């Protein structure tokens, strides 16, 4: 029997789940738009969908913030209907061999900083900055970075007085241990500086391929958190950022100079990375590492199919949109190929070369989110394999165990 959510969304297949509940594809019965539906039992011990829906309403209209289509109670469950988005940066990181080029990291960093700044401008902290919570868009918004999962978000300004929340200590760790700030590990109340420090760890994770505190053995979660804390605090910034541009060390040093209630200079941090981008001669052409890999695979697959009829490429990108299309028949493969051809004018088998001709002006003086006003193309996510979630995943601070975002079907195991 078909299940209709909110009177107009026909529930489809399950694409993910976690301690909060489950995530499904759904189709609008009239427009056939494909959306994502997050469902939780209304009697759950720690319901979060109502709070999350409230946050999305507050952030509504911001670039890179998913739109809420509907929220309400459906029988015995709470349901949140949202824009369907593409793969997470964690998915794409794995797809690209667990390392991103500096060019890709810098293009992502600019948008990620803008997302965090926007959330802060609305008076909230995210408190769970990690690769799994940044998703790429689909179709014409495939180059736009989205920030999701506000289940752990918290106001840092009093709604009535607009005063900053008071400094506190002895707080439980809230967020994901791998990317948590040093102060968060030490039990200090989080503020804007902590979201930014977490972003720094995400960027280094992308550049390095891993962080020094991954893979630590422990008998339980507390011991693991303690070991991560000890390793993180004892690792000098210069060691963490060794063999990478000095701007990344400067980023961390700046974060560590911020006082508890100080407003970060987001523009300074973006200029730091934009100047590096310009100095390296990169062009802001939205050709990410995965764009090139997808293009190369498309070319290889095309050549193989010409040589052997019926052959196919066994390695699927997490943004494959061959199934469950809800809008125009737009192939991500063709889209990626076109971007590579038109932007770089490169040959049929491009290599990942992130340099442009000397003196070329990068595209930072143009809006980063140049596609934000274009119509969205509703496409389905690809890989929906469930993976185990390890002890470094999000912790809400009240001991409820692991908690994942609404795209948990894309989650990779913590190491």
From Swiss-Prot:
Disruption phenotype: Hypersensitivity to blue light (BL) leading to shortened hypocotyls in BL. Belongs to the protein kinase superfamily. CK1 Ser/Thr protein kinase family. Casein kinase I subfamily. Its EC number is 2.7.11.1. ATP binds at residues 15-23, 38. Residues 303-330, 344-415 are annotated as: Disordered. InterPro entries: CK1_Ser-Thr_kinase, Kinase-like_dom_sf, Prot_kinase_dom, Protein_kinase_ATP_BS, Ser/Thr_kinase_AS. This is Casein kinase 1-like protein 3. Disulfide bonds: none annotated. Residues 303-314, 373-415 have a biased composition (Polar residues). Expressed in seedlings, stems, leaves and flowers. SUPFAM superfamilies: Protein kinase-like (PK-like) (SSF56112). Keywords: ATP-binding, Cytoplasm, Kinase, Nucleotide-binding, Nucleus, Phosphoprotein, Serine/threonine-protein kinase, Transferase. Slightly autophosphorylated. GO terms for cellular component: cytoplasm; nucleus. One of its GO terms (molecular function) is protein serine/threonine kinase activity. Transmembrane segments: none annotated. Protein kinase involved in blue light responses (e.g. hypocotyl elongation and flowering) by phosphorylating CRY2 to reduce its stability. Residues 9-277 form the Protein kinase domain. It is found in: Cytoplasm; Nucleus. Induction: Induced by blue light. The lineage of its organism: Eukaryota, Viridiplantae, Streptophyta, Embryophyta, Tracheophyta. It comes from Arabidopsis thaliana. The gene is CKL3. It catalyses: L-seryl-[protein] + ATP = O-phospho-L-seryl-[protein] + ADP + H(+); L-threonyl-[protein] + ATP = O-phospho-L-threonyl-[protein] + ADP + H(+). One of its GO terms (biological process) is blue light signaling pathway.
